[in-house]
Amino acid sequence: LSPDSDCDRAESDRNDRLSEVKITRTENLSEAQKQSIIRLWNAEYPVQIQHSGIDSFDEYLRPKANLRHYLLIDPDEIIRGWLATFIRDDERWFALLVDGSQQKKGFGTMLLNKVKEFENEINGWVIDRENDVKANGELYLSPIGFYLKNDFEILSDVRIENETISAVKIRWSR
């Protein structure tokens, strides 16, 4: 066997194991879990909304009432995705992240479907323009198509526009 086929086999084995991910629900994150989520956040979201560390992330989480975290964990116990739900303005909202190397494999849908088991409605902000940049210099691609495929509606008349973010409100309901 050539070294290339060994690498291909190792990647195939890893992908097979990733099909064995689990979703864990918790109300409290450990410091290690927070660090993992911050790494994901800073890699996947536009640079202007990055967190400088745990204090910044805690400040983001602090005002959110009735907070629940859903962690997508691979067989190596690595967090590959995070979905948080919380109450804001008397509505259930969510934030979702999936490791870029694991996107387009159904994991984001898995996380959403897990939350849909417990909720009648969830709302979110989604960046719907492609003019933001990620930390690695790549363009941040809007996930709006992903949410449409997962039965969300776009509330185009409800937007957030400020120096940090431009986004439209989305909603899923039973």
Whereabouts are the PLM-identified features?
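A short, internal acetyl-CoA/4′-phosphopantetheine-binding micro-motif in the GNAT/acyltransferase core
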Residues: A95-K104, D128-N131
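Active-site rim helix/loop that mediates acceptor-substrate recognition in acyltransferases
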Residues: P46-Y70
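A conserved beta-turn-beta hairpin within the catalytic core of GNAT-like acetyltransferases
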Residues: I87-F94, Q103, N120-I122
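Conserved GNAT acetyl-CoA-binding A-motif
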Residues: F118-A135
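C-terminal "cap" of GNAT-fold acetyltransferases
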Residues: R129-N131, L139-G145, E153-R174
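Short amphipathic alpha-helix that is part of the acyltransferase structural core
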Residues: R17-D55
